[in-house]
């Protein structure tokens, strides 16, 4: 997610601040033209801070999920893709 694709706005009714995406997505017709321009604003900093706070709060859970997925991926690559980690075959002893 590119945080500078969002703009901080105030809700006219509730007066709460929220982020609204103003940048087109890759599939949009105007995307190629839009990418020719460079926008920089400090408005995305609160969103970045909020995302970092969420990551910090759930850091242990995130790493646990990554570790579980890494173990699954290692098993899948070893067993299913390369056939290097199968059960040992009985070979005659010398």
From Swiss-Prot:
Belongs to the canopy family. This is Protein canopy homolog 1.
